[in-house]
Amino acid sequence: MNQTLLSSFGTPFERVENALAALREGRGVMVLDDEDRENEGDMIFPAETMTVEQMALTIRHGSGIVCLCITEDRRKQLDLPMMVENNTSAYGTGFTVTIEAAEGVTTGVSAADRITTVRAAIADDAKPSDLNRPGHVFPLRAQAGGVLTRGGHTEATIDLMTLAGFKPAGVLCELTNDDGTMARAPECIEFANKHNMALVTIEDLVAYRQAHERKAS
C-alpha cells in the first residue's frame, strides 16, 4: 500500500491505535486491504454499537451487501450453515446463509431492520430460532487466528473489535463510488476524511498484532 497516501492518518501503529479509539468512540473505521488482493476499502462498525444512521450511511455508500462478521463459535451457536459446502470464491470468503431477525422487523431491508437483525444475532443468549433464513444480512465466518491466518476484511474486523474491547462481531460493507465502481485507496481516504472515520490497512494490523504478540511471549 502506498504509504504516502496514508501518511495523513499517521504511522502504521498509530493508524491501528486510532482505529481502536474511533471504534470505542462509536465512529466507523475504513479498512483497506492490499492493492494486490481485493484492493478495496470496507466500512466497519462494532455490531454492539452501530446506529441506524451508520447503517443507513453504509447502505447508501456501500455495495448493499451488509455483512456481519462472526466467529466460528457464534456460527455454531446460531446453527448457521455455510452458504456452500465447496467454497470456490477467489479468496475463500466465509459466507453463511443469510439472516433476518425473527421478531421486530418488517421487510428486513431497511437500515433499522438490519440493525435489529444484527443485534438479535449477537445477543449473548441468541439461539437459532431468533433468526429467520434467508434475510438481508450476510454473516461472514472469520478464520481462527484472525489476520495472522487470513488477511481478509472479515478477520480484520474481528481482530479490531476484540482489540477495542467489544464482542468479536462487527458489521462491514465495501465502499463503492457513485458511478457503481469499487472505491480504491484514494476514494476510500477521501470518504474516511469526509465522514470522520479512522483508516487502517490489514497490513498495519498484521504488523501490530505480530509486534504485540512477540512482546507478550
Curated annotation (Swiss-Prot):
It catalyses: D-ribulose 5-phosphate = (2S)-2-hydroxy-3-oxobutyl phosphate + formate + H(+). Keywords: Lyase, Magnesium, Manganese, Metal-binding, Riboflavin biosynthesis. The record marks 136, 174 as: Essential for catalytic activity. It holds the Pfam family DHBP_synthase. Mg(2+) 2 binds at residues 38, 153. One of its GO terms (molecular function) is manganese ion binding. One of its GO terms (biological process) is riboflavin biosynthetic process. D-ribulose 5-phosphate binds at residues 37-38, 42, 150-154, 174. SUPFAM superfamilies: YrdC/RibB (SSF55821). Its EC number is 4.1.99.12. Mg(2+) 1 binds at residue 38. Binds 2 divalent metal cations per subunit. Magnesium or manganese. Pathway: Cofactor biosynthesis; riboflavin biosynthesis; 2-hydroxy-3-oxobutyl phosphate from D-ribulose 5-phosphate: step 1/1. Its cofactor is Mg(2+); Mn(2+). GO terms for cellular component: cytosol. PANTHER family: 3,4-DIHYDROXY-2-BUTANONE 4-PHOSPHATE SYNTHASE, GTP CYCLOHYDROLASE II-RELATED. Catalyzes the conversion of D-ribulose 5-phosphate to formate and 3,4-dihydroxy-2-butanone 4-phosphate. HAMAP family: RibB. Belongs to the DHBP synthase family. Homodimer. This is 3,4-dihydroxy-2-butanone 4-phosphate synthase. It comes from Escherichia coli (strain SMS-3-5 / SECEC). The lineage of its organism: Bacteria, Pseudomonadati, Pseudomonadota, Gammaproteobacteria, Enterobacterales.
